[in-house]
């Protein structure tokens, strides 16, 4: 009816739902353990919280991953390497910023060598607060990322 009105067809809407459902069940993160938050990230991947039940398998290579978890303090010298890892990931890709230091610099905010948030280097989809955030907080952040992926239009033109 109006200029901004978009009608997605049945096939497009169904394919979007199917593709996004499949993506949420097979998130493969590459990890950047920059500080103490990495310990909690490993804790989340261990037996008690078992991220495998969500279809999350940690990958050693960014070329095999679709989620980047930035866990810890990002220093100025590490920023180009983080950007390179992000650029090597295939599309679609998502980023989780884990911990106060990755979110905004944390305790080291006023240090000369710290990037005040990894969102200055790469686009961030989900922020997990805390110093360090618990494994439950990371699991909750991953569930929020899955909800964000489900709501995304994959094939429909905008």
From Swiss-Prot:
Pfam families with a match to the protein in the record: Oxidored_q6 (PF01058)
Entry membrane topology: Peripheral membrane protein
Listed EC numbers: 7.1.1.-
Residues binding [4Fe-4S] cluster, per UniProt: 36-37, 101, 131
SUPFAM superfamilies referenced in this protein's UniProt entry, alphabetically: HydA/Nqo6-like
UniProt keyword annotation of Cytoplasm present: no
GO BP, one annotated term: aerobic respiration
Cofactor note: Binds 1 [4Fe-4S] cluster.
MF-aspect GO terms: 4 iron, 4 sulfur cluster binding; iron ion binding; NADH dehydrogenase (ubiquinone) activity; NADH:ubiquinone reductase (non-electrogenic) activity; quinone binding
Catalyzed reactions: a quinone + NADH + 5 H(+)(in) = a quinol + NAD(+) + 4 H(+)(out)
Enzyme class, broadest EC rank: translocase
Keyword 4Fe-4S attributed: yes
Keywords in alphabetical order: 4Fe-4S, Cell inner membrane, Cell membrane, Iron, Iron-sulfur, Membrane, Metal-binding, NAD, Quinone, Translocase, Transport, Ubiquinone
Primary location: membrane
Subunit structure: NDH-1 is composed of 14 different subunits. Subunits NuoB, C, D, E, F, and G constitute the peripheral sector of the complex.
Family, per entry: Belongs to the complex I 20 kDa subunit family.
Function: NDH-1 shuttles electrons from NADH, via FMN and iron-sulfur (Fe-S) centers, to quinones in the respiratory chain. The immediate electron acceptor for the enzyme in this species is believed to be ubiquinone. Couples the redox reaction to proton translocation (for every two electrons transferred, four hydrogen ions are translocated across the cytoplasmic membrane), and thus conserves the redox energy in a proton gradient.
PANTHER family the UniProt entry points to: NADH DEHYDROGENASE (PTHR11995), NADH DEHYDROGENASE [UBIQUINONE] IRON-SULFUR PROTEIN 7, MITOCHONDRIAL (PTHR11995:SF14)
UniProt-listed HAMAP family: NDH1_NuoB
Name of this chain's protein: NADH-quinone oxidoreductase subunit B
Species annotation: Francisella philomiragia subsp. philomiragia (strain ATCC 25017 / CCUG 19701 / FSC 153 / O#319-036)
């Amino acid at each position: 009816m109006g200029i901004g009105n978009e009608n997605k067809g049945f096939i497009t809407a169904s394919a979007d739902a199917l593709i996004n459902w499949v993506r949420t069940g097979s998130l493969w993160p590459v990890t950047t353990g920059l500080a103490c938050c990495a310990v909690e990230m490993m804790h989340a991947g261990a037996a008690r919280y078992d991220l495998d039940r969500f279809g999350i398998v940690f990958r050693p290579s960014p070329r095999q991953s679709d989620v980047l978890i930035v866990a810890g303090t990002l220093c100025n010298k590490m920023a180009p390497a983080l950007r390179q890892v992000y650029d090597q990931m295939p599309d679609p890709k998502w980023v989780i910023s884990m911990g106060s230091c990755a979110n905004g610099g944390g305790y080291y905010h006023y240090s000369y060598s710290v990037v005040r948030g990894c969102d200055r280097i790469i686009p961030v989809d989900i922020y997990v607060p805390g110093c360090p955030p618990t494994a439950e907080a990371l699991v909750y952040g991953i569930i929020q990322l899955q909800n964000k992926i489900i709501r995304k239009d994959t094939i429909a033109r905008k």
